[in-house]
Amino acid sequence: VHLTGEEKSAVTALWGKVNVEEVGGEALGRLLVVYPWTQRFFESFGDLSTADAVMKNPNVKKHGQKVLASFGEGLKHLDDLKGTFAALSELHCDKLHVDPENFRLLGNVLVVVLARHFGKEFTPELQSAYQKVVAGVATALAHKYH
Protein backbone atom coordinates (compact mmCIF):
# COMPACT_ATOMS: atom_id res chain seq x y z
CA VAL A 1 0.00 0.00 0.00
CA HIS A 2 1.42 3.35 -0.97
CA LEU A 3 0.62 5.97 1.63
CA THR A 4 2.33 9.28 2.15
CA GLY A 5 4.00 9.84 5.50
CA GLU A 6 1.12 12.12 6.43
CA GLU A 7 -1.45 9.45 5.52
CA LYS A 8 0.39 6.78 7.54
CA SER A 9 0.51 9.09 10.56
CA ALA A 10 -3.19 9.93 10.26
CA VAL A 11 -4.23 6.28 9.86
CA THR A 12 -2.10 5.22 12.82
CA ALA A 13 -3.29 8.10 15.01
CA LEU A 14 -6.95 7.30 14.41
CA TRP A 15 -6.37 3.57 14.90
CA GLY A 16 -4.98 4.33 18.34
CA LYS A 17 -8.44 5.61 19.30
CA VAL A 18 -10.39 2.65 17.89
CA ASN A 19 -12.21 0.40 20.35
CA VAL A 20 -11.35 -2.85 18.56
CA GLU A 21 -14.01 -4.88 20.36
CA GLU A 22 -16.83 -2.44 19.63
CA VAL A 23 -15.85 -1.49 16.08
CA GLY A 24 -14.92 -5.06 15.14
CA GLY A 25 -18.24 -6.46 16.30
CA GLU A 26 -20.16 -3.72 14.55
CA ALA A 27 -18.23 -4.08 11.30
CA LEU A 28 -18.62 -7.86 11.10
CA GLY A 29 -22.25 -7.57 12.19
CA ARG A 30 -23.00 -5.04 9.48
CA LEU A 31 -21.28 -7.24 6.89
CA LEU A 32 -23.54 -10.15 7.88
CA VAL A 33 -26.68 -7.98 7.79
CA VAL A 34 -25.96 -5.99 4.62
CA TYR A 35 -24.54 -8.97 2.71
CA PRO A 36 -26.53 -11.88 4.18
CA TRP A 37 -24.93 -14.49 1.91
CA THR A 38 -21.75 -14.04 3.99
CA GLN A 39 -23.56 -15.67 6.92
CA ARG A 40 -22.90 -19.12 5.44
CA PHE A 41 -19.33 -18.90 6.73
CA PHE A 42 -20.59 -18.33 10.27
CA GLU A 43 -23.30 -20.97 10.71
CA SER A 44 -21.68 -22.11 13.97
CA PHE A 45 -22.28 -18.66 15.49
CA GLY A 46 -25.90 -19.40 16.41
CA ASP A 47 -28.82 -17.05 15.78
CA LEU A 48 -28.23 -14.80 12.77
CA SER A 49 -31.91 -14.68 11.78
CA THR A 50 -32.47 -10.93 12.15
CA ALA A 51 -30.34 -7.79 12.10
CA ASP A 52 -30.90 -7.42 15.84
CA ALA A 53 -29.85 -11.03 16.49
CA VAL A 54 -26.68 -10.56 14.43
CA MET A 55 -25.69 -7.30 16.09
CA LYS A 56 -26.21 -8.74 19.59
CA ASN A 57 -24.62 -12.12 18.88
CA PRO A 58 -21.60 -12.60 21.19
CA ASN A 59 -19.84 -14.83 18.64
CA VAL A 60 -20.10 -12.10 15.99
CA LYS A 61 -18.67 -9.57 18.44
CA LYS A 62 -15.85 -11.90 19.47
CA HIS A 63 -14.85 -12.76 15.90
CA GLY A 64 -15.16 -9.13 14.83
CA GLN A 65 -12.71 -8.20 17.56
CA LYS A 66 -10.33 -10.92 16.35
CA VAL A 67 -10.60 -9.66 12.75
CA LEU A 68 -9.93 -6.07 13.76
CA ALA A 69 -6.99 -7.06 15.97
CA SER A 70 -5.49 -8.74 12.91
CA PHE A 71 -6.20 -5.63 10.83
CA GLY A 72 -4.39 -3.57 13.48
CA GLU A 73 -1.36 -5.85 13.14
CA GLY A 74 -1.45 -5.18 9.42
CA LEU A 75 -1.26 -1.45 10.08
CA LYS A 76 2.13 -2.08 11.69
CA HIS A 77 3.36 -3.71 8.47
CA LEU A 78 1.88 -1.60 5.68
CA ASP A 79 4.94 -2.25 3.52
CA ASP A 80 4.48 -6.04 3.72
CA LEU A 81 0.76 -6.77 3.84
CA LYS A 82 1.10 -9.92 1.72
CA GLY A 83 3.65 -11.34 4.14
CA THR A 84 1.67 -10.23 7.17
CA PHE A 85 -1.53 -11.86 5.96
CA ALA A 86 -0.04 -14.90 4.14
CA ALA A 87 -1.16 -17.45 6.74
CA LEU A 88 -4.65 -15.94 7.00
CA SER A 89 -4.93 -15.87 3.22
CA GLU A 90 -4.04 -19.54 3.05
CA LEU A 91 -6.52 -20.42 5.83
CA HIS A 92 -9.38 -18.51 4.20
CA CYS A 93 -8.58 -19.92 0.75
CA ASP A 94 -7.69 -23.56 1.42
CA LYS A 95 -9.65 -24.44 4.55
CA LEU A 96 -12.54 -21.98 4.85
CA HIS A 97 -13.14 -21.40 1.11
CA VAL A 98 -14.17 -17.80 1.66
CA ASP A 99 -14.91 -15.81 -1.49
CA PRO A 100 -12.12 -13.20 -1.59
CA GLU A 101 -14.65 -10.53 -2.60
CA ASN A 102 -15.85 -10.69 1.00
CA PHE A 103 -12.56 -9.13 2.16
CA ARG A 104 -13.27 -6.08 0.02
CA LEU A 105 -16.84 -5.88 1.31
CA LEU A 106 -15.69 -6.07 4.93
CA GLY A 107 -13.08 -3.38 4.30
CA ASN A 108 -15.70 -1.05 2.91
CA VAL A 109 -18.02 -1.77 5.84
CA LEU A 110 -15.14 -1.03 8.22
CA VAL A 111 -14.67 2.39 6.61
CA VAL A 112 -18.39 3.12 7.11
CA VAL A 113 -18.19 2.07 10.77
CA LEU A 114 -15.10 4.22 11.36
CA ALA A 115 -16.90 7.18 9.80
CA ARG A 116 -19.89 6.57 12.05
CA HIS A 117 -17.75 6.36 15.17
CA PHE A 118 -15.45 9.29 14.46
CA GLY A 119 -17.75 11.71 12.63
CA LYS A 120 -16.05 14.92 11.56
CA GLU A 121 -12.68 13.60 12.69
CA PHE A 122 -12.95 11.05 9.87
CA THR A 123 -12.18 13.57 7.15
CA PRO A 124 -12.36 12.83 3.41
CA GLU A 125 -8.54 12.68 3.39
CA LEU A 126 -8.54 10.13 6.20
CA GLN A 127 -11.25 8.14 4.46
CA SER A 128 -9.14 8.10 1.31
CA ALA A 129 -6.15 6.77 3.26
CA TYR A 130 -8.26 4.09 4.96
CA GLN A 131 -9.75 3.06 1.60
CA LYS A 132 -6.21 2.47 0.35
CA VAL A 133 -5.39 0.41 3.45
CA VAL A 134 -8.52 -1.77 3.35
CA ALA A 135 -7.99 -2.36 -0.38
CA GLY A 136 -4.40 -3.39 0.32
CA VAL A 137 -5.46 -5.74 3.11
CA ALA A 138 -8.18 -7.27 0.90
CA THR A 139 -5.64 -7.83 -1.86
CA ALA A 140 -3.20 -9.42 0.60
CA LEU A 141 -5.89 -11.72 1.99
CA ALA A 142 -6.85 -12.75 -1.56
CA HIS A 143 -3.22 -13.39 -2.52
CA LYS A 144 -3.26 -17.19 -2.04
CA TYR A 145 -6.29 -17.46 -4.32
CA HIS A 146 -4.23 -16.60 -7.39
Swiss-Prot record:
Tissues with expression: Red blood cells.
Single Gene Ontology MF annotation: hemoglobin alpha binding
Keywords for this protein: Acetylation, Heme, Iron, Metal-binding, Oxygen transport, Phosphoprotein, S-nitrosylation, Transport
Record: residues binding heme b: H63, H92
N-acetylvaline modifications at: V1
Domain of life, source organism: Eukaryota
Modified residues (S-nitrosocysteine): C93
Domain Globin residue range list: 2-146
Pfam families per record: Globin
InterPro entries linked: Globin, Globin-like_sf, Globin/Proto, Hemoglobin_b, Hemoglobin_oxygen_transport
SS bond partners: none
Post-translational modification Phosphoserine, affected residues: S44
Phosphothreonine: residues carrying this PTM: T12
Keyword RNA-binding: no
Modified residues (N6-acetyllysine): K82, K144
Single GO cellular component term: haptoglobin-hemoglobin complex
GO biological process: hydrogen peroxide catabolic process
Subunit organization: Heterotetramer of two alpha chains and two beta chains.
Family that this chain belongs to: Belongs to the globin family.
Function: Involved in oxygen transport from the lung to the various peripheral tissues.
Name this polypeptide is given: Hemoglobin subunit beta
